[in-house]
């Protein structure tokens, strides 16, 4: 069960990165997960509360919270 949960989390992160590249809305949702997309995230920081934090730190963990929202 734990292994599946870990794999599921990784898939969500990858999916969020793909969405962020395909549509601008995806950047706001999972912007924290993609350090490279941090610049775009800053423009739409208002859409996501923890987005600005994720952009500065560039941590993958923040991306999980963003995708959940």
From Swiss-Prot:
Keywords: Antibiotic, Antimicrobial, Bacteriocin, DNA replication inhibitor, Plasmid, Thioether bond. The keyword Chloroplast does not apply. There is a cross-link at residues 40-41 (Thiazole-4-carboxylic acid (Ser-Cys)). Transmembrane segments: none annotated. Residues 1-26 form a propeptide. The processed N-terminus does not resemble a typical secretion signal sequence. Maturation of thiazole and oxazole containing antibiotics involves the enzymatic condensation of a Cys, Ser or Thr with the alpha-carbonyl of the preceding amino acid to form a thioether or ether bond, then dehydration to form a double bond with the alpha-amino nitrogen. Thiazoline or oxazoline rings are dehydrogenated to form thiazole or oxazole rings. There is a cross-link at residues 47-48, 50-51, 54-55 (Thiazole-4-carboxylic acid (Gly-Cys)). This is Bacteriocin microcin B17.
């Amino acid at each position: 069960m734990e292994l599946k949960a870990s794999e599921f989390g990784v898939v969500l992160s990858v999916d969020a990165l793909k969405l962020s590249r395909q549509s601008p809305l995806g950047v706001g949702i999972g912007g924290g997960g993609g350090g490279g997309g941090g610049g775009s995230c800053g423009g739409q920081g208002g859409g996501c509360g923890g987005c600005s934090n994720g952009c500065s730190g560039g941590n993958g963990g923040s991306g999980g919270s963003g995708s959940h929202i």
